Amino acid sequence: MGVVVSLDEGKRKAAASIAPLVEATRDAMDRVNELILDRCGSDVGMIPEVARHLIDSGGKRLRPMLTIASASMCGYRGSGHVKLAGSVEFMHTATLLHDDVVDESDLRRGKLAARMIWGNQASVLV
């Protein structure tokens, strides 16, 4: 038999369930976030604006956390996993931007979708 869970309760349970993963990947995720911020720079003024909008819109960064955790579980000791995790997050973000254009979404994570601010073409190109 199924159980209906309120959205607020579901969010709290989800956050609690990934807390051990967040803690286990904290140091490497700090480096991933630094990498993401560093790579969002550009001489084209709109690119950092769109990037900042996306970064500030939240999200759990679950995919890069899983990348970091997988590297750790496999005994990886290098630093390449940070770049890989950043790449995974960039790819995910690109799919979200594209999805918002295709679906003509006005909002992403409760904020105006990038396409609503900068238009469809700019959102896809960034």
Name each region found by the language model.
Residues 20-126:
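Mg2+-dependent prenyl diphosphate-binding active-site environment of isoprenoid biosynthetic enzymes
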Residues 1-4, 118:
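Acidic, low-complexity proline/glycine-rich segments
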Residues 14:
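ATP/NTP phosphate-donor binding region
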